[in-house]
Every structure is written in C-alpha cells, then in structure tokens.
Curated annotation (Swiss-Prot):
Miscellaneous: Predicted models used for more than 20 years predicted 10-12 transmembrane segments. More recently, the structure of SLC9A1 has been solved and reveals that SLC9A1 possesses 13 transmembrane regions.
Modified residues annotated as Phosphoserine in this record: 603, 606, 609, 652, 697, 701, 707, 727, 730, 733, 790, 792, 801
Organism listed in the record: Mus musculus (Mouse)
Region called PI(4,5)P2-binding region, residue ranges: 513-520, 556-564
Region (Disordered): 40-74, 748-820
Protein name (database record): Sodium/hydrogen exchanger 1
Family of this protein: Belongs to the monovalent cation:proton antiporter 1 (CPA1) transporter (TC 2.A.36) family.
Region of interest called Confers pH-dependent PI(4,5)P2 binding, as start-end residue ranges on this chain: 544-549
Residue ranges with Polar residues bias: 785-796
Entries under InterPro entries matching the protein: Cation/H_exchanger_CPA1 (IPR018422), Cation/H_exchanger_TM (IPR006153), NaH_exchanger (IPR004709), NHE-1-like (IPR001970), NHE_CaM-bd (IPR032103)
Tissue expression: Expressed in kidney, brain and stomach.
Known catalytic reactions: Na(+)(in) + H(+)(out) = Na(+)(out) + H(+)(in); Li(+)(out) + H(+)(in) = Li(+)(in) + H(+)(out); Li(+)(in) + Na(+)(out) = Li(+)(out) + Na(+)(in)
Cytoplasmic compartment segments: 126-134, 181-190, 254-256, 327-332, 376-377, 443-448, 510-820
Residues at the site labelled Channel pore-lining: 165
Amino acid sequence: MMLRWSGVWGFHPPRIFPSLLVVVALVGLLPVLRSHGLQHSPTASTIRGSEPPRERSIGDVTTAPSEPLHRPDDHNLTNLIIEHGGKPSRKAFPVLDIDYPHVRTPFEISLWILLACLMKIGFHVIPTISSIVPESCLLIVVGLLVGGLIKGVGETPPFLQSDVFFLFLLPPIILDAGYFLPLRQFTENLGTILIFAVVGTLWNAFFLGGLLYAVCLVGGEQINNIGLLDTLLFGSIISAVDPVAVLAVFEEIHINELLHILVFGESLLNDAVTVVLYHLFEEFASYDSVGISDIFLGFLSFFVVALGGVFVGVVYGVIAAFTSRFTSHIRVIEPLFVFLYSYMAYLSAELFHLSGIMALIASGVVMRPYVEANISHKSHTTIKYFLKMWSSVSETLIFIFLGVSTVAGSHQWNWTFVISTLLFCLIARVLGVLVLTWFINKFRIVKLTPKDQFIIAYGGLRGAIAFSLGYLLDKKHFPMCDLFLTAIITVIFFTVFVQGMTIRPLVDLLAVKKKQETKRSINEEIHTQFLDHLLTGIEDICGHYGHHHWKDKLNRFNKKYVKKCLIAGERSKEPQLIAFYHKMEMKQAIELVESGGMGKIPSAVSTVSMQNIHPKAVTSDRILPALSKDKEEEIRKILRSNLQKTRQRLRSYNRHTLVADPYEEAWNQMLLRRQKARQLEQKITNYLTVPAHKLDSPTLSRARIGSDPLAYEPKADLPVITIDPASPQSPESVDLVNEELKGKVLGLNRGPRVTPEEEEEDEDGIIMIRSKEPSSPGTDDVFTPGSSDSPSSQRIQRCLSDPGPHPEPGEGEPFIPKGQ
C-alpha cells in the first residue's frame, strides 16, 4: 500500500506520518506526564489556577485539579535532622532533572503550532484530497481526532477559550484582510456591503429568534422555559457570517472580485451589529422590564460601536503613518510599528466595548499608502509575509480547536431545536439575499444576476466567532447555554462541511466568473484613471455629487495636506510614474559608470524635459550630455511656444452665471501665433528656390523633404537638406539666399572647400552644394551632394515643427535629410 501511494501521489508517507504521530502522541501524553508528580518546580504554584480542567486552552496555564506534591524545604529538613541528633546527609548532584511545569505553556503552544503547520503541509502534498475537500474541513477533522485521542487516554482535552480566540487568534486574520483589502472594489460596493451587513444581519437575527421562540412554545417540556430574549440573543449569535470561514473557503475557489468583496465585506462589517445585539440582549436578560428608552439607547449604541471603532482605527493609522516618517535610519523596526499600532487599535476598541474588527480594518486601510511610501522594499516584503504567515497559523489553530472543543465540551441535544435552527438559518439567509438584492438592483449599474445571488446566499458560512460568543454565555442567566452551543456547532459543521465542500462544484456547474490572476496592464490602469476623471467631470457639469465627486475631493485634500504631513521628503510631491522614470534613469547611469560605456546616456530632449519637471533636482549626480547654452535656450523657446497648459474643469455649471476661464485669452493668442507661424512656414517652403543669374545660375527645383528618410538611400544627383532647429517666432532666422551668398553660390571655385569631416562636425543646417559642371543654356543646373570640387554651401534654418512642402505630382524624388 505504501508503494502504491508513493507511485500515484508522488510522496512517501513514512516520511511525514511518523512526525505527525509523534506530535499527536506527545500532545496526548503530556497530561499523563503531568499527572505523575512532575510538577515540583517552584514556578508551578504561581501558574496554577483554580478553573476546572475543561477550561484549559493553549493560552490557559491551569493544571489538573489534583493536589500537588509539596516538597519540604531543604533548610527545614536540615534543622529537623539536627534536632534529632543526626547528621545531615549531603544531597547528590542531579545529573538529569525533569522540570516540565517550568516550560509547559510555551512547549504546548509550540507543539500545537507545529501540528498545525505539519497538517497544512500534509494536505497540500496530496492534491487529490485538497482539490475536493476544503482545508478548513480537514483541519476540523484533525481536531476531532486529536481531541478523541486525548480523551481516550483519560485526560480532558483543552478547550478554546473566548479570550484566547478574540485577543490572540482573531486579530492577525482581520489585520491581514484589512491591510491588503482591495480598496477600490470595497469603496465602489460599500453601499451594497452595508445593506447586506446591517439590514441583512438584523433580518436574520430577528427572523431566526422569533421563529425559534415559536418552536420553543410548542416543542416540548425540555425547551418550554426558553424565553424570547434568549432566542433573540441566540439568533444574533448565529446570524452573523464568519470572516474566517469565508476567507478559508472563498480563497480556494477563486471567485470573482465582486462576489468575494460582497460576501467578505459583509462578514467584516456585520461585527458591529453582532456586538451590539449580543450585549443588548445580554443586558436585557438581567432586567425585570425593558422600556422604550432602553431600546432607543440600544439603537444609539450601534452607531457608537461602529463609528467609534472606525475612529479609533483611523487615529492609530495616522499615528503609524506619521511614525514611519522617521524610520529611514532604522529600517529594522519598520514592520514592528505596523503590527503594534494595529494591535493597539484592536485592544483599545475592545477596552471600550467598541468594534475591534472595524478598528483593525480602519487602521490597516489608513496606514498602508503612507507607510509603504516611507518604508523600504525589504520592510514591505517583511510585513506582507509575516501577516500572511501569522493569519494562516491562526486560522489553522482556530479550526483545529473547533474540533478539539467539540469533543471536550458538554452538549445537550434536542432534535426539534437543533433541526429548526439549521432550517431557519438557511431560509432566513435565502429570503434576506433575495429581498435585499431586488432592492439593491434598482440603484446598481452592474446588476447582481441570479447566479450571483445564489453564491452570496450559499456563501453565508458560520465559524468560530459564533462558537466563542456562545461559549461566553453565563449559565446563571442562560441555563440552556449547552443546548445553544450544541446547535451552534451543528450549524458551523453543516455550513463548513456541506456548503464549503459543494460550493466549488456549484461554481463550476453554474459557470460563475472566476478571479483573474493576472495584474492589470499599464494601459488598463491609465484608462481606468482617465474614466475616473471623465466621470468626475460629468458629475461636476451635471451638478450631481456622486462617489466620483467625493473621491476627487478626498484625493485633492490628500495631495494638498495629508501627504505633506505623513510622507517624508520629496516623495510626497513626486508623481509615481515620474519617480519610477527617475529611478530607472539613475539605475542606467550607475550601470553606465560601472561598465565604462556611453550607450545608455539619456537623450538631450529627455534630459531637458526631466529638468523642467524637477527644477529643484540636483543634476550633479547624473551623467548628462554636454549642451550649449544657445541650443538649450533654443529648445526652451520651442517648448514655451508650442506647449500649452491643461485647462482646468469648471467646478459647476449654472445657466445664469458662467465662470470665466482665465486661460481663454492666452489660448486665443496662442492660436493666432500658431496660425501666423503656419503661414510663414508655408511661404518659406513654397519659395525655397535659388534665383537665376543669367546663364551660369539657372533656377533650382523646388526643395522638398521626404516623409520617411529611413526608407530611401541617398542618391548622388539629389541635394542633401538638414534642419537646424529655430524658433517659429523669429523669421529673421530664416535666411533665404542673401546677397552676400549669391556670389559664392554662383562662383564655381571661389568658395572654401568643405571636407566630409568638417561637414560632419559643422552644425546641422540645410546645405545645398552645386556641381562643378555647368549646364547648357536653357536647362537647370542640378545640385549634387558631396562633390569632389570646391562647392559652395548655403544654410537655411527651419523650425522643427515644419514638415516641409507637400509633394506635388509629377516632380522628382524627395530630398533626403542629412544624418538620419
């Protein structure tokens, strides 16, 4: 059988199963070792508590209730022997001593974490099982087996205490979800998420509580004593969707972003409703009568709990972002601030009975953009992987201890109550989703289809939050808490096992859109931002203040004030694309210096454009090509005359009062200047000829520039034209054949000879060279480039924006620009 497994699944069970058996055996035998008198450490009395054995958990340090063996003090023993006339015997030096109580708590915690990690490795080694059964189901099964093994050796299995769950296991999962929350999808669907989280949870709680109260009235003697407040409290516990269970299942099926954010966002934001309802009904259960003022205060406490948690999270997020400004010299502690401030936000919210989950989400969302702008790339990687590791281990321990606590807990079974609870949970979820979606689709542009509604209703999983809240119930006020806990475990197991295992085949069967694994391209990002600005402008014109309008307001406020306070240095002013371009240029310059080459130096135009964008940047550290002041000034003139400032949108439109555009006059003047420049260029190109001078200098053909110079090879019988940049506002720079050059052009051998080397070193310009041999009377001379005789040269400067004259049919080949 071992050989068959090794050949089929590609792994060797003997390599991993013995380790698992050793860990399980150690966990089971530790209580046995503890009961055999190994608690003789002096620290054992300080960590021993008085709680019953079933209260022990991974964070609880209580021991078995048996009386410890007290050793007499060595000094008293010596005095006793001396009083009876004996000599004290010398104690032998202990070569090996066992002091397990001294290390019991961290040792057991390490063993449980090691068991969780080995289980995750074992599940993913067997792809057949992991593709069919969700990981959460397998972990619960492992917990059931470990709990049964511990109970089989005669010991009480550890129980998942609520304080351990809420203070140590839940925060890492929520922080990981809040820090890496897809903010765009979350904000765009915030209204839908709030309706599902608030209205849907209230509907489920009261619908389930009311129907269960009716069932208790007719269900028999065992459940007749359950009152309305008891069933409403139970309904508020079991109605909330659990974020841990949703994350564990939805991350494996890779559902699309819309459905994932709707279900997961609902599970995050319904925490405030669950906390308020839980404390409200728990307080009402101890009252003799409940008045209208109590109900109003309970309704008011919902806003206090929700908004108070958000406020606490925002405050700690801002403090964390501000602190990260000053960590540039001590990069090692940067990740620690993220963890500490987030955890402090959660504990501060729990201190005032606010929503700790809302505080964690708010702190993670607020601090992330500013912290990542201040910290190094290595710190960002550390934060990412540590949060993922921490949340994964916590999630694994939660599901394992759900199974262990099921074996360890005391249960009370009632078929009527348990089956009714399970049935009413499913009915309430389906009805709530259908009714709320019908209302939501009236206001949504992208409607939720029936397939989407089915996945949302089917994805309402329950988990450890409901279990921990049920365990917190006081048996004095709620004598049926064991029955409630049994019903909660039944609902959790049904949703995790049945719904969790069947949701993947149903998604494939219904052909629900899956999540795209690839990241969006730069083109998609640019178009997305363009559409955001476009929709913001449309809302401004229409006078409609939608979420695009408020998003634009927040972005402006963020850039103007917040970034300057929370982001260090010039990074708060520099756009991301320009910063990335500057970083790449610096990297290329460093590589260029190290290699000793000159092939990667940025071009002159690129360098000058970047200097204009960053006027305060220090250019001494960058390797730039030498530019003469005249050429740089010439380029600046061209940019000033041809570039225009972007017009700003009007803030609002009113048919009675129109806001004047301050750039309108400058815009009209610029259009006039461009029109004059085009007319001047047209005149230049139309009359670009050399006038005839008797018989020796016939007229030249009209000069033209080819549209694609790289597509042609230079010909010997064509003149060569190069363009020297000049300002279009300076017509004096356009020097058409003046009187001094006429004589040089007409003379055959009077001009200086231009060698090819001098021609290459000379500045660019339109150079026309006349051939040596004169033509016969009545025919045109043809100017050829590169003549061996001493030709005459003539320069014509033209603006870079001039494309040259348009080709006319019937004329010769176009001139080829020089040097291209």
